[in-house]
Structures are given as structure tokens and as C-alpha cells.
């Protein structure tokens, strides 16, 4: 029968409490995976056939989150337009996180390093390693946090992206098989929380 899905609350934010946390967001946990959803504001235009409801998954074993962004373009508050690559519809955006657990409440904070993982055969694209280095250099992140983050990131890459020494034609386990049941669930929220960022 397998593990049962349990309801949890999720808070999300930037590293070290810079800015307010967003939440609580209703979510679910199945084994070592959490899924939660929130609605993007109207300035985000969804891909055809999709809504502004964004589902994010968190792999607790390595402390990373990932989502298949539901939007194709957005108008930023300064009036500029950010447009996704048309090939990006089925790509995944992955973030390294810190994870804090208090009962059934999970707080996830961004830990700078990101990777975009396409599912159409293109290579992945690493981002924000410079921000990670800056946080270590200026003391925003402790040395111990930095070491832990890099070790978990390498475990993620080895376990889910390339588990052989030499890269294969596809990803080892991405999107991970462990998220399949949560991916297939209908909408998790009856009244989604809207992000106003």
C-alpha cells in the first residue's frame, strides 16, 4: 500500500530571514517528499492550457525544491517584461534550500544555488554560484552552512541528475520517481494562497 499522504504547512523565504516569510501554504508530505502550491498574481501569464497555480516539490533527503514554472511571461513592477524560452515549457527550476521542521510546519529558505533542468535533451544550466560565494565571503552564510549546502547539492546532482561518472543521454532520476504520486494529485488547495511578490 505504501506510505500515506499527510497534510503539512509550508513557509518559504530567502536565506537568513531577509524579508518576510511567505505562508503558511497548505502542502502534503509523502515519505521524503513535500508538495505545496500557491497562486501567482495576475501579472504572470500562464502557458496555454495551464493556470497560475504553481506546484513545488521538496526532496527532504537533499534539501532541494523544484517546480515546472506555470508561466510564460510576466510584467515586472518596473514595467519590464520577462519571457520564458518557448522551449522551457517542460523545464524544471531547482533551488538549494535550508529546511527547518517544527511539528507539521516546514520552513524552506533559498540557499542561492539553482539549476534549470530541461526535459528535451538540452544540458542543465547552473545559476547563482557567485551569490553563494558572496554569502560565504561576507558572512551572510556561515562556513558550516556553506559546507553542508555544497555537500547536499552534490548528493542531489549525483543521485538525481547523473549517477554515473560520465553523463548519460538522460537524467538518472529526474523528475524523481518519488514525486509521481504527488505530481498526479488534483489541486492540493481549495482556496490557494496568492503570492503578491
Residues covered by each model-derived region:
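Short, well-ordered loop/turn elements at secondary-structure boundaries
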Residues: 30, 87-88, 118-120
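Cysteine/selenocysteine-centered motifs that mediate thiol-based redox chemistry or coordinate metal-sulfur cofactors
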Residues: 152-197
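Charge-rich, low-complexity N-terminal segments
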Residues: 1-56
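Intrinsically disordered terminal and processing segments
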Residues: 34, 39, 44-48, 52-59, ...
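A long amphipathic alpha-helix within ATP-dependent nucleotide-binding catalytic cores
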Residues: 95-97, 101, 106, 150-163
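A hydrophobic, small-residue-rich beta->alpha segment in the mid-to-C-terminal subdomain
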Residues: 111-159
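Structured beta-strand/loop patches that form or line metal/cofactor-binding pockets in enzymes
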Residues: 56-113
Amino acid at each position: 500500500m505504501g506510505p500515506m499522504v499527510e497534510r503539512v504547512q509550508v513557509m518559504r523565504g530567502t536565506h537568513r530571514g531577509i524579508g518576510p516569510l511567505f505562508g503558511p501554504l497548505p502542502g502534503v508530505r509523502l515519505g521524503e517528499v513535500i508538495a505545496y502550491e500557491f497562486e501567482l498574481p495576475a501579472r504572470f501569464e500562464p502557458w496555454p492550457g495551464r493556470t497560475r497555480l504553481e506546484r513545488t516539490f521538496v526532496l527532504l533527503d537533499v534539501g532541494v525544491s523544484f517546480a515546472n514554472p506555470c508561466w510564460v511571461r510576466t510584467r515586472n513592477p518596473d514595467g519590464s517584461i520577462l519571457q520564458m524560452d518557448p522551449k522551457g515549457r517542460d523545464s524544471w527550476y531547482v533551488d538549494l534550500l535550508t529546511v527547518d521542521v517544527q511539528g507539521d510546519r516546514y520552513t524552506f529558505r533559498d540557499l542561492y544555488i539553482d539549476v534549470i533542468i530541461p526535459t528535451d535533451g538540452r544540458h542543465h544550466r547552473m545559476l547563482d554560484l557567485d551569490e553563494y560565494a558572496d554569502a560565504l565571503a561576507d558572512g551572510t552564510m556561515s562556513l558550516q552552512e556553506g559546507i553542508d549546502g555544497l555537500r547536499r547539492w552534490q548528493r542531489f546532482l549525483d543521485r538525481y541528475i547523473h549517477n554515473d561518472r560520465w553523463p548519460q543521454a538522460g537524467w538518472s532520476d529526474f523528475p524523481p520517481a518519488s514525486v509521481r504520486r504527488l505530481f498526479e494529485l488534483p489541486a492540493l488547495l481549495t482556496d490557494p494562497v496568492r503570492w503578491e511578490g
